Amino acid sequence: MSGEENPASKPTPVQDVQGDGRWMSLHHRFVADSKDKEPEVVFIGDSLVQLMHQCEIWRELFSPLHALNFGIGGDGTQHVLWRLENGELEHIRPKIVVVWVGTNNHGHTAEQVTGGIKAIVQLVNERQPQARVVVLDLLPRGQHPNPLREKNQRVNELVRAALAGHPRAHFLDADPGFVHSDGTISHHDMYDYLHLSRLGYAPVCRALHSLLLRLLAQDQGQGAPLLDPAP
């Protein structure tokens, strides 16, 4: 499926429906902030990335890696693609780019969302050939079982298959088991049944941090050959 046929893989800025220009202001700030930085890791995605920056676990685990956080609430894959094409990777040479986006691609099929994520990976590979890409799985959402959970799970299956064997991209299933045996999600983990609480972020961030350290060690010749996390 080409970018012209797939809206999820066509770079598109967010429409400023509220009229305050905040999205574009954040984008310009990210570009400006990156000019004097030498991050080992860059995070890019939606509110799940953005809100991570406000948690103590960010300072504990990711600040020591000189990580940059380019998360914007509400972004879909097409918006991240636009941001990456318009300067957010221009002034830096990270060792790893973490991508967490797709749950906001409303109106797009699982196949289209997968195409958008694959386009992001390809763009990072082209713009930052030295960097590895880590794609986080889309988490379940909603207190009770619902079609969006099923769609996100399908995206995860497709992305995992698409990245299998990719030499510079890795898929991380960071869901520690947010869905309970009765099919519900607790507000202790996701306070609004979408966004993570501090309690919810902890296992996700620790799993991600472990993978990042393994990747960084491997690239420095200090680690054993990396195996992607098991399903």
From Swiss-Prot:
Q: In this UniProt entry, which cysteines form S-S bonds?
A: none
Q: Which reaction does it catalyse?
A: a 1-O-alkyl-2-acetyl-sn-glycero-3-phosphocholine + H2O = a 1-O-alkyl-sn-glycero-3-phosphocholine + acetate + H(+); 1-O-hexadecyl-2-acetyl-sn-glycero-3-phosphocholine + H2O = 1-O-hexadecyl-sn-glycero-3-phosphocholine + acetate + H(+); 1-O-hexadecyl-2-acetyl-sn-glycero-3-phosphate + H2O = 1-O-hexadecyl-sn-glycero-3-phosphate + acetate + H(+)
Q: Which Pfam families match?
A: Lipase_GDSL_2
Q: Does the keyword 4Fe-4S apply?
A: no
Any one Gene Ontology BP term: lipid catabolic process
Name the residues annotated as catalytic in the UniProt entry: S47, D192, H195
Q: What is its EC number?
A: 3.1.1.47
Q: Report the GO molecular function annotations.
A: 1-alkyl-2-acetylglycerophosphocholine esterase activity; platelet-activating factor acetyltransferase activity; protein heterodimerization activity; protein homodimerization activity
InterPro entries the record matches: SGNH_hydro (IPR013830), SGNH_hydro_sf (IPR036514)
Alphabetized UniProt keyword annotations: Acetylation, Cytoplasm, Hydrolase, Lipid degradation, Lipid metabolism, Phosphoprotein
- List N-acetylserine occurrences by residue: S2
Misc remark: Originally the subunits of the type I platelet-activating factor (PAF) acetylhydrolase was named alpha (PAFAH1B1), beta (PAFAH1B2) and gamma (PAFAH1B3). Now these subunits have been renamed beta (PAFAH1B1), alpha2 (PAFAH1B2) and alpha1 (PAFAH1B3) respectively.
**Protein name in UniProt:** Platelet-activating factor acetylhydrolase IB subunit alpha1
List the source organism: Pongo abelii
Q: What is the lineage of its organism?
A: Eukaryota, Metazoa, Chordata, Craniata, Vertebrata
Q: Which gene encodes it?
A: PAFAH1B3
